[in-house]
């Protein structure tokens, strides 16, 4: 069999998107980010609580385009100790990933509070907050699940959020899906704005 040479894509444009990654402590936010940025090769085995906000930059090439979206992932501490401080890092954030642990009903309920906090922190209240809801640790035995996935899906649908059930534990079931979704949504929104601007110029 002759192997086809995969040529690198020549990126013609790079867009940048700030994304708040939120959820209670220990739900696996940092582990998900690590699995995504390392393409599944690096899982955080030793837990270390995030203090405040840590920024991770992850480039995503949009399929069938020559455009790259750099996700500036704001890995946000889930502890109540930091909630009063972290909103200062959210200036200009209109995209978010809400993460909960399927074995913790409390972590699911807290996503609702995080969602409202993010909406209230928007500098421009007219712009929508585009977010996804992520059920993590779905590899755990069913008897440990406290949150039904259909219940989480219903809440996400009600609030116009995409929903993903994932596992950051290797090999990382669909761990990249939430990030790819955010990048694609940001790209499409950008394209819509460009098209609207071009139409306005033609009609001027």
UniProtKB/Swiss-Prot annotation:
GO cellular component: cytoplasm; cytoskeleton; intraciliary transport particle B; motile cilium
Coiled-coil residue spans: none
Protein origin, superkingdom: Eukaryota
SUPFAM superfamilies hit by this protein: P-loop containing nucleoside triphosphate hydrolases
Keyword DNA repair tagged: no
InterPro entries xref list: P-loop_NTPase, Small_GTP-bd, Small_GTPase
Recorded GO MF terms: GTP binding; GTPase activity
Binding site residues for GTP: 23-30, 75-79, 136-139
Keywords, in A-Z order: Cell projection, Cilium, Cytoplasm, Cytoskeleton, Flagellum, GTP-binding, Nucleotide-binding
UniProt key word Ribonucleoprotein: no
Compartments, as annotated in UniProt: Cell projection, Cilium, Flagellum; Cytoplasm, Cytoskeleton, Flagellum basal body
Pfam families: Ras
Family, as annotated: Belongs to the small GTPase superfamily. Rab family.
Function: Small GTPase-like component of the intraflagellar transport (IFT) complex B. Forms a subcomplex within the IFT complex B with IFT25. Has very low GTPase activity either because it lacks the conserved catalytic Gln in position 79 or because it requires some GTPase-activating protein (GAP) for GTP turnover.
Subunit structure of this chain's protein: Component of the IFT complex B, the core composed of IFT25, IFT27, IFT46, IFT52, IFT74, IFT81 and IFT88 as well as associated subunits IFT20, IFT57, IFT80 and IFT172. Interacts with IFT25; the interaction is direct.
Name this polypeptide is given: Intraflagellar transport protein 27
Species of provenance: Chlamydomonas reinhardtii (Chlamydomonas smithii)
